[in-house]
Amino acid sequence: MTSVQTRLEKINSNKFLLFSLLATGFIMLYVNFLDSETRTLISDLLYVPIPGAMLVLSLVIAIRFGITGKHGKAWILFALLSVSWFTAEQIWMIEELVYKIDPWPSLADFFYLTGYPFLFAFSIFYLLPLRKAISKKLVTIASLISVTILIPTFSLVYQSNSSANDFEIVLASSYPVLDALVLCPALIGISLFFKGEVNFLWTLICGAIVLNVVADTGFLMLTIDDSYYTGHPVDLLFLWAYLLFAFGVYHHIKIFKSHIKDPYENIDELR
């Protein structure tokens, strides 16, 4: 009975995830047919409940596991990431909706950039218990892919003929560097999923990282080209990334609730 109930919960959760992704996609498509003021308002407001859900869930799981072991430390780092990025989103919204100023570059970038070291450290701590399944070849391939993506993006920033000043160029170029940093462990995590070493729920988080990297790259190119606007389709990738993060954390809370002291005591439960 418990097994059947667990399966039903997973099916319902996956349906809710799919519904959330589709609903968010529909809203972002719809706002692009509205006037710019309404589009900006609705798009900015979406960054309250969606990153907010990620924040609340990350605090719940961080409190649940505490600072015990690598897994506990990992979730504390993830909670710090969530706080940092949620703060950044609210600063962006306030500057754009209340103060009517361009939120890029702004204080929001400080909190966006601050989140990346937390995300990288979280990924490392989380993958450490699986280090025996991670080969040097896998690390090398993931690193090469990350660098391969970094170089052209970095190059385009400096070769751009946009009106951005030196500070904006340096600020913009720091995003692809940090994206490459977090992309490497995410690719390792996805590879482990296809090898059967980790479950789909951990892959949600890795997928969220990849989506965020793609969104960052798109946002960067559009901003340098002065063609970005709030509500642009690229924003959907950021929102989807937050949703995947939130659902990944939620499912981890469900899976590991009975393994607080040693969530990797039975490694098969990750598969």
Question: Which role fits each region the language model picked out?
Answer:
Residues 1-271:
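Polytopic alpha-helical membrane-helix bundles and their juxtamembrane interface segments
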